[in-house]
Design a protein with these regions (language model features):
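Structured secondary-structure scaffolds
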Residues: 1-263, 282-325, 329-330
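Generic long, charged, amphipathic alpha-helical segments
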Residues: 269-270
Length: 330
């Protein structure tokens, strides 16, 4: 055991499985992956490989709590009972009293009169918790008029190719024949400025409240916006100071613009055709930056937006355009 360091004895016991080959579950899931947009693109191959090489899904667990596997098994034949009326009755019971109704209501209340409750075992196993989380699309999206299914985007850490993305795909494909998402975005994890996992024992944790107190919320927002979430995100005093400097440059650029436009009236507006070449060039660059930012937003490429806007403000506006035109203002 990883917790007690004591040796474990493994024993095989009968379990419930979801077959990856029956009804072409694996093949359909792989086809759905091909239709999905991944951010970053490398996530597609990772999820594809995991689905392609996974064994059948062991669905059952033996625990004292959880979502039950509502199945009756014939004690003589070992076959599960396949009766739509019984299944519908179980569904109705769950809607009224929750899934615990399976453990609280006797088998005779679910079975048709033609069945002898003594001939059937009411399974007490619970479902794998990943099956629970993989089903969230059903009650989050399908039961709400203001949302659509499938989801535009599933967003989680890169470890969820093996977890939530994985189970959601298999559950949805198995029950609905399609993936529950159109896109998947994965991000890295927050580390210290040396690339180490944060730990109290190492004393390298960073409390967001400390950043808010010492630097303000905008600095923390800029750190988020400027970090490449495709990789693990580093944070520390020097990194925060770096973003503080960027913030100061952006703020000074905006202050200069607002100060220069103080008292501007609409009737002072100049037609584009009458503008000097330098202003025409600048408006052209503004349009280029605008189009580039919109394109990057569509691709969730936020850290590139941060870099582009910062460079435009500090290099093209502040260092170039302002320097040329300041004599006209003063």
């Amino acid at each position: 055991s990883w917790r007690s360091k004591a040796p474990l004895v493994f024993r095989n016991t009968p379990q419930w499985f979801i077959s990856m080959t029956t009804n072409n579950l694996k093949e359909t899931a792989l086809n759905e992956i091909e239709k999905t947009q991944f951010y970053p693109e490398a996530g597609k191959q990772r999820l594809y490989y995991m689905i392609e090489n996974r064994p059948d899904w062991c669905l059952s667990r033996q625990r004292a709590w959880g979502i039950p596997i509502p199945v009756f098994v014939n004690k003589k034949t070992g076959e599960p009972l396949r009766d739509k009326i019984v299944i519908d009755r179980i569904v109705s019971s769950f809607k009224k009293g929750g899934s615990d109704a399976w453990f609280e209501i006797p088998a005779s209340n679910y079975l048709e009169p033609e069945y002898d409750a003594n001939d059937f075992e009411q399974i007490q196993d619970i479902a794998d918790v990943w099956f629970d989380s993989g089903s969230t699309h059903a009650f989050v999206l399908e039961d709400r008029d203001d949302l659509k299914s499938p989801a535009n985007l599933y967003l989680e850490g890169s470890d969820q190719h093996r977890g939530w993305f994985h189970s959601s795909l298999l559950e949805s494909v198995g029950s609905r024949g399609v993936a529950p998402f159109e896109g998947i975005l994965t991000h890295g994890f927050v580390l210290d400025d040396k690339g180490r996992k944060m730990s109290k024992s190492l004393g390298n944790t960073v409390n967001p409240q400390d950043i808010l107190r010492d630097y303000g919320a905008d600095i923390l927002r800029l750190w988020v916006a400027g970090s490449d979430y495709y990789e693990d995100l580093r944070i520390g005093p020097e990194i925060i100071k770096h973003h503080t400097d960027h913030y100061r440059r952006l703020r000074n650029t905006l202050r200069y613009l607002l100060g220069s436009l103080n008292g501007f009236q609409e009737n002072e507006k100049i037609d584009y055709s009458d503008m000097p070449q330098l202003e025409k060039w600048l408006l052209h660059r503004v349009n280029e930056v605008n189009n580039s930012v919109r394109e990057k937003i569509e691709g969730y490429n936020f850290h590139s937006i941060y870099t582009e806007i910062h460079n435009f403000c500090t290099i093209e506006l502040s260092s170039f355009y302002f320097e040329i035109r300041k004599d006209l203002l003063y």
